Amino acid sequence: MNGEPFRAGERVVLLDERGRRFLVRLEGGGTFHYHGGALPHDLVLGSEEGTTVHSTTGASLLCFRPRLADFVLKMGRGAQVIYPKDLGPILISADVFPGARVLEAGTGSGALTLALCRAVGPEGRVVSYERRAEFLEVARGNAQDFFGKVPAWLDLRDGDVREVAGTGETFQRVLLDLPEPWAVLDEVGAVLGPGGILCTYLPTTGQVQEAVAAMRDARFAEVETFEVLLRTWHVAPRSVRPDHRMVAHTGFITVGRKTA
């Protein structure tokens, strides 16, 4: 879609003069109302990315297609999401590659699911388990909203991830966003191939201690835990300093590799 004009039915990020972002679905004849006035959708439809449009009060808005990070922060939620600052490091530390077979547990609202689907691409496969049907439907809707349709390589399953042990499937990567990942380690470890990577996402140190102990008992190697602290900077001609606010702790990321 990059390089093509905006069309009805797709999403646009509208960026105001103060850097505030608004995620809007474009409809012919529709209108976006906000504190800066009203913006007819028809002013955006047919225009290119990076175009500046003006509301009824003359306020300027820049038009861009949403990044995954924009979508994750604005999408529908059933459960708390993994934030963009953690999604990138998870994909890199778990070495999620195009064509990979990935097992996820704890779909939630689908933020990590979307990132995994885009990372593995059509040649890969993402199987995602969620025990709460209402969360799974939110994730399904978000996948359809972001990709235009639910990707053919995404398999959303209503149930306990331990059920995967009886399917005969094997995976190269396993990612667990569960409060007690150690409780499913035997089953997910059985379907993870030798050299495969297991990644957990947990909010507290107590949970991390128990998860790491279980991974070491199961003979996982290179077990490592880290967190990501994001600090943006204010850069001006006469001043360069950290911004007054930063995004600190959101969760601990633990990775380990399965041995033969």
Label every model-predicted segment.
Residues M1-R65:
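N-terminal auxiliary segments of SAM/dcSAM-dependent transferases
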Residues Y129-L176, P181:
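S-adenosyl-L-methionine
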Residues F97-G108:
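Conserved class I S-adenosyl-L-methionine
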Residues I92-F97, A119, F147-G148, A165, ...:
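Glycine-rich helix-loop-beta junction characteristic of Rossmann-like nucleotide cofactor-binding loops
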Residues L185-F252:
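C-terminal substrate-binding/active-site "lid" region of AdoMet-derived donor-dependent transferases
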Residues E123-V127:
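Short beta-strand element of Class I
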Residues G3-E4, K74-L87:
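Conserved SAM-binding loop and adjacent beta-strand
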Residues S109-P122, A190:
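Conserved SAM-binding loop of SAM-dependent methyltransferases across substrates and taxa
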